[in-house]
């Protein structure tokens, strides 16, 4: 326990302290930027200056800074976050590192994502659950290709709030001219992104200027500190305003007298008495109970794990989607999606993969790669395949009808993963843009050939046979 927490508990009492912590709003954010822009140092500074470091951690940090530090006599705060041995030895971030801290106003979960292009898939993983992105820019270098790449990926993954931290201002003598030039360059580029708010702040993570506390060296800057921007960022309950979406995780039948359908509410506010539809079947019924471990609820909010019962006996199974009967999503076997490719082997159109969308498991294939996105310049390039860490806009066909929402509306029902059928490794992550009309099967193959092809791909996936028609 650190001194800050110990003081708060002694003043408030343990129960009051825990109650206050439980009811604070939560902001999930990620830090991203070019290599050596100071992402891990910035997080370390946030933890240090907000008094979130325990005494034993501080002692270990002092020792590690002497052995592995890259900051001379100063504490190397990046070592608080860079946990892998390879990261510490190279002074870079490889894995996605998660950290938790809180202030008097809010709780935070941080994703520290790698800056190198070969770890794009790691960054996509970190960004997929975040509400806000901190884009770091080295004041000496300005807006780089990697800055554009990280900004685009964060935007693609649905993050609508950006805080641009122009770091290492101490190395440009805290120049307002440099800051204004970088701000103008970034705002011009950001016109291409789907972002609601962009705030730009000058900082020095190494010395702590304008991170948690204001700095006299940046007297010309009249805005808030970085931490103040994070504390005041808008964390709207966006999902509560959407229609009800409840992916069925499993059928809960502990005895002959009870049959409920369990899952985590993805969107909307679900109330007893609501009329829901089951997709893809389309059957409808009324909710009679919302059951949880702690007892029945009158209503449930997004993120809650619940079990619902219905007034009618209807066929519902794992993978179905329970939705507001008056506001149903689209059901289709064909979607247009951005795919981030994570596999060592390239994505080949026509190759069949296992597909998982929310709780639904099916099979599918990429029919066409419309274009590959050159993520440094945002150019759209022709492509016949996608390689590791590449992103493309693809037409995907599935063997079963699926209900979905566009990813920009509801992440949980608008995203999917592609799984290699032989190795069971996740090789791709998809964000659905829209549904597509079904295409007619080409006539150059006989019905027997199409069925034989489907049989081979089902029972001999290691042959990596390409699809020639619908299954």
UniProtKB/Swiss-Prot annotation:
Residues 167-170 are annotated as: G4. Pathway: Sulfur metabolism; hydrogen sulfide biosynthesis; sulfite from sulfate: step 1/3. Keywords: ATP-binding, GTP-binding, Nucleotide-binding, Nucleotidyltransferase, Transferase. Transmembrane segments: none annotated. Residues 204-206 are annotated as: G5. Its EC number is 2.7.7.4. One of its GO terms (molecular function) is ATP binding. The keyword Magnesium does not apply. It catalyses: sulfate + ATP + H(+) = adenosine 5'-phosphosulfate + diphosphate. Residues 112-115 are annotated as: G3. It comes from the Bacteria. One of its GO terms (biological process) is sulfate assimilation. Residues 24-240 form the tr-type G domain. Pfam families: GTP-eEF1A_C (PF22594), GTP_EFTU (PF00009). Residues 33-40 are annotated as: G1. CDD domains: CysN_ATPS, CysN_NodQ_II, CysN_NoDQ_III. InterPro entries: CysN_GTP-bd, CysN_II, CysN_NoDQ_III, G_TR_CS, GTP-eEF1A_C, P-loop_NTPase, Small_GTP-bd, SO4_adenylTrfase_lsu. Gene3D superfamilies: P-loop containing nucleotide triphosphate hydrolases (3.40.50.300), Translation factors (2.40.30.10). HAMAP family: Sulf_adenylyltr_sub1. Belongs to the TRAFAC class translation factor GTPase superfamily. Classic translation factor GTPase family. CysN/NodQ subfamily. Heterodimer composed of CysD, the smaller subunit, and CysN. This is Sulfate adenylyltransferase subunit 1. It comes from Aeromonas salmonicida (strain A449).
């Amino acid at each position: 326990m650190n001194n800050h927490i110990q003081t708060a508990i002694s003043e408030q009492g343990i129960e009051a302290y825990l109650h206050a912590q439980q009811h604070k709003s939560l902001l999930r954010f990620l830090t991203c930027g070019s290599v050596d822009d100071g992402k891990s140092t910035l997080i370390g500074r946030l933890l240090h200056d907000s008094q979130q470091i325990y005494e034993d951690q501080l002692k270990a940090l002092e020792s590690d800074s002497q052995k592995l530090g890259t900051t001379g006599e100063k504490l190397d705060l990046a070592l608080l976050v860079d946990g892998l041995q390879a990261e510490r030895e190279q002074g870079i971030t490889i894995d996605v590192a998660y950290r938790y801290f809180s202030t008097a106003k809010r709780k935070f979960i941080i994703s520290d994502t790698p800056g190198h292009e070969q770890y794009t898939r790691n960054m996509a993983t970190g960004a997929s659950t975040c509400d806000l992105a901190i884009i770091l820019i080295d004041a000496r270098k300005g807006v780089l290709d990697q800055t554009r790449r990280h900004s685009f990926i964060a935007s693609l993954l649905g993050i609508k709030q950006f805080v641009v931290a122009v770091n290492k201002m101490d190395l440009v003598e805290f120049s307002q001219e440099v800051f204004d030039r970088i701000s103008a360059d970034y705002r011009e580029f950001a016109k291409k992104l789907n972002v609601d708010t962009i705030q730009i702040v000058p900082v020095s993570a190494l010395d702590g200027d304008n991170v948690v506390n204001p700095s006299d060296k940046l007297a010309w800057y009249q805005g808030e500190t970085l931490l103040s921007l994070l504390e005041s960022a808008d964390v709207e309950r966006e999902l509560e305003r959407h229609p009800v979406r409840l992916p069925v995780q499993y059928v809960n039948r502990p005895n002959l007298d009870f049959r409920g359908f369990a899952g985590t509410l993805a969107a909307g506010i679900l109330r007893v008495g609501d009329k829901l539809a089951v997709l893809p079947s389309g059957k409808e019924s009324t909710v009679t109970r919302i059951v949880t471990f702690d007892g029945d609820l009158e209503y449930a909010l997004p993120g809650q794990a619940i079990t619902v019962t219905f007034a009618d006996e209807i066929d519902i199974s794992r993978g179905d989607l329970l939705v507001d009967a008056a506001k149903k999503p689209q059901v289709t076997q064909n979607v247009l999606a951005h795919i981030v490719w994570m596999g060592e082997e390239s994505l080949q159109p026509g190759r069949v993969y296992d597909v998982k969308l929310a709780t639904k498991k099916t099979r599918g294939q990429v029919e066409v790669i419309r274009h590959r996105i050159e993520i440094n310049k945002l150019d759209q390039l022709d492509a016949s395949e996608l390689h590791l860490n590449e992103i493309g806009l693809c037409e995907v066909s599935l063997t079963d009808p699926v209900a979905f929402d566009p990813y920009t509306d509801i992440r949980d029902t608008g995203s999917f993963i592609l799984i290699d059928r032989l190795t069971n490794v996740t090789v791709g992550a998809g964000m659905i843009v829209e549904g597509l009309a079904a295409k007619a099967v080409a006539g150059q193959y006989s019905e027997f050939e199409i069925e034989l092809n489907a049989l081979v791909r089902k029972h001999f996936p290691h042959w990596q046979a390409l699809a020639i028609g619908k299954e």
